[in-house]
Amino acid sequence: METIFAQSSAFGKAGVAVFRISGPKSLEVLQLLTGRKDFKPRLMYYQQIIVPETNELIDNAMVVYFKLPNSFTGEDVVEIHTHGSKAISIMLINTLLNIADIRLAEAGEFTKRAFLNNKFDLTAAEGIADLINAETIMQHRQAVRQANGGLKELYNKWRNQLLKIISLLEAYIDFPDEDIPESILNDVNNTHKNIVNEISNYLNDNRRGELLNNGLKLAIIGPPNTGKSSLLNFLMQRNIAIVSNIAGTTRDIIEGHLDIGGYPIILQDTAGIRTESTDIIEQEGIKRAINSAKTANIKIVMFDAEKLDSSINNDITGLIDENTIVIINKIDLIEPNKTFAIENRYKCLRVSVKNNIALSNILKNIENIAENLAGVTETPYITNQRHRHYLKQALSHLIDFNLDNDLVLATEDIRMTVRCIGLITGVINVEEILNEIFKNFCIGK
């Protein structure tokens, strides 16, 4: 296995820069860079880092050596902590590149080596990637659970139950003259039924994990000039949309990303929806607004309190569902006791974006809907499409399983199910099935 290195911290100006080296020559490289031989594992040393050919000082650094297998990758690993200077990083990288039999690591190669050395399964590796990319508290919680084996436990439970079924059935395939006892048939059928139900329910999750990973799309829609762009600017805490009294100012979709209650929200301000527009560009903007709302996870439908009754149309109300927040804006311009017919149909929030009246209620409602759609629960979620794809394949094989038909074909359906789950976790091993058989049956006795 080659020795690899990379700067693990971001390149650029910072307090500290961290370099990682992994592979059989790691300790030798550290000794070459420092001129010191007596490094003990897991102890941090303050050392000068030099260019071996010239003895030029690169930096005074903290270094540590991890002896295999007690390291992140399971190999010999060295970490070098220098000052976070671009010049230092360039000098150290060039120095490492000039050392024989060491190369720059490929993207994700340290984690890949950790997986290959059985430090964790593929779901945990994906959890580490999600943890690095997490931008909100809820994304972090989901990623931490996955990185610490939350999904592995669930998938391995199903896999072990299926291996048990295979071991039972394989024994009777090898000894066809013996009838399968009724108790074993019942155990197999009950286990099969339970796994089918569990995977079916697990897949029927409304893609909560993927929503949390990728962000919940929130579309702000409504008639023209109701304050949609002002609301977007308020939520984003900066002016990213042009605000004007002229109807139709917003033509295209304006997008922003924010964190509300720990949930990642992708905000979209859209063109005002009205039926009487003759402007071709505005008509295209209205079309895009409606399409945006149809694909949104959360919708805010916004009306102007002064023009509410005359601005309601079916294009707008037809988009309202259980994940919609209906807002009556500019309440500072009407009498406090004025009521609207739409309030009899929907729960409405009365606000004034301009004068910051009741805007916290909007944030709370967004958070409540986001929690309902993607809130973290005790059961780990499916977090990406790869898992969902193989679980659907696994379920298909389980549904095909039938002990009333050929026993070999039935066993193959279970074996294919195990393979699909193994493709998720990265564990596919025929020896496990053999071990299960020999553990439970006294073959040849």
Swiss-Prot record:
Its cofactor is K(+). Mg(2+) binds at S229, T250. It holds the Pfam family MnmE_helical. (6S)-5-formyl-5,6,7,8-tetrahydrofolate binds at R20, E79, K119, K445. Residues 215-371 form the TrmE-type G domain. Keywords: Cytoplasm, GTP-binding, Hydrolase, Magnesium, Metal-binding, Nucleotide-binding, Potassium, tRNA processing. One of its GO terms (cellular component) is cytoplasm. Its EC number is 3.6.-.-. Its main location: cytoplasm. InterPro entries: G_TrmE (IPR031168), GTP-bd (IPR006073), GTP-bd_TrmE_N (IPR018948), GTPase_MnmE (IPR004520), MnmE_dom2 (IPR027368), MnmE_helical (IPR025867), P-loop_NTPase (IPR027417), Small_GTP-bd (IPR005225). CDD domains: trmE, TrmE_N. GTP binds at residues 225-230, 244-250, 269-272. One of its GO terms (molecular function) is metal ion binding. SUPFAM superfamilies: P-loop containing nucleoside triphosphate hydrolases, TrmE connector domain. K(+) binds at N225, S244, I246, T249. It is found in: Cytoplasm. Binds 1 potassium ion per subunit. NCBIfam families: mnmE_trmE_thdF (TIGR00450), PRK05291.1-3 (NF003661), small_GTP (TIGR00231). Belongs to the TRAFAC class TrmE-Era-EngA-EngB-Septin-like GTPase superfamily. TrmE GTPase family. Homodimer. Heterotetramer of two MnmE and two MnmG subunits. Exhibits a very high intrinsic GTPase hydrolysis rate. Involved in the addition of a carboxymethylaminomethyl (cmnm) group at the wobble position (U34) of certain tRNAs, forming tRNA-cmnm(5)s(2)U34. This is tRNA modification GTPase MnmE. It comes from Rickettsia prowazekii (strain Madrid E). The lineage of its organism: Bacteria, Pseudomonadati, Pseudomonadota, Alphaproteobacteria, Rickettsiales.
